[in-house]
Design a protein with these regions (language model features):
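Basic, flexible linker segments flanking DNA-binding modules
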Residues: 1-60, 65-68, 136-139
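RNase H-like DDE/DDD metal-dependent nuclease/strand-transfer catalytic core used by mobile genetic elements
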Residues: 20-21, 55-62, 67-77, 83-195
Length: 197
């Protein structure tokens, strides 16, 4: 019961019934060569991934938000990151990230650093309504970007590596925060974020 005619089973029978010791990898190679089994699909090679980086600062910003724990509750941390330099333009703590907050932090960062040529984000509702089924028109950020003549780019659904730079930044930030006592308030979390950046 539960045994098949795979390499491990064949190795067991050869060893126990015929006294022959052979590696499972050898049996597998022979079975594949004989066309008796299909090789398992392999992972995509790293070389097949299309890596990109903006050529200049302010060519493209990436943005995302993540959840962080407080001593008694949760908060959300919104990040704006320059794709070329990986400079954290803005890292802010909020009870909940909303469309107006996204626009406020974006316009403040633009006033401080100059606006980017394009913005890359995931498909969260605070960034785009393109998957909202046509309800409600454009959101706050989409309207602001059109008014400023800034190109908006999105990752494909279920492809978080497209926004990998900001995702990696947030992963590092969360590890750094986890090594410290949990803040009690949004203001205390913001003080920690200011110390990180």
């Amino acid at each position: 019961q539960g045994l098949d005619a795979g390499p491990a089973t064949i190795v067991w029978h050869l060893q126990h019934h015929h006294g022959i010791t052979v590696a499972a990898a050898t049996v597998r190679r022979r079975l594949v060569a004989a066309g008796l089994i299909e090789p398992e699909p392999r992972k995509r090679p790293r070389s097949s991934y299309i890596r990109f980086q903006a050529e200049l600062p302010n060519e493209m910003w990436q943005t995302d938000f993540t959840h962080c724990g407080l001593a008694h509750g949760q908060a959300e941390v919104l990040t704006w990151l320059d794709d070329h330099s990986r400079y954290a333009l803005s890292v802010t703590a909020h009870v909940r990230v909303t469309g107006p907050i996204v626009v406020d932090t974006f316009t403040q960062s633009g006033a401080d650093q100059g606006f980017p040529a394009s913005v890359l984000s995931d498909n969260a509702m605070v960034y785009t309504t393109r998957f909202a089924g046509g309800r409600g028109g454009r959101n706050h950020l989409e309207v602001a970007l059109v008014e400023l003549g800034i190109t908006q780019k999105h990752s494909r659904p279920n492809h978080p590596t497209t926004c990998g730079k900001v995702e990696r930044f947030q992963q590092t930030l969360k590890k750094w925060l986890a090594a410290r006592p949990a803040p009690d308030t949004i203001e205390a979390l913001q003080a920690l974020l200011d110390g990180f950046t």
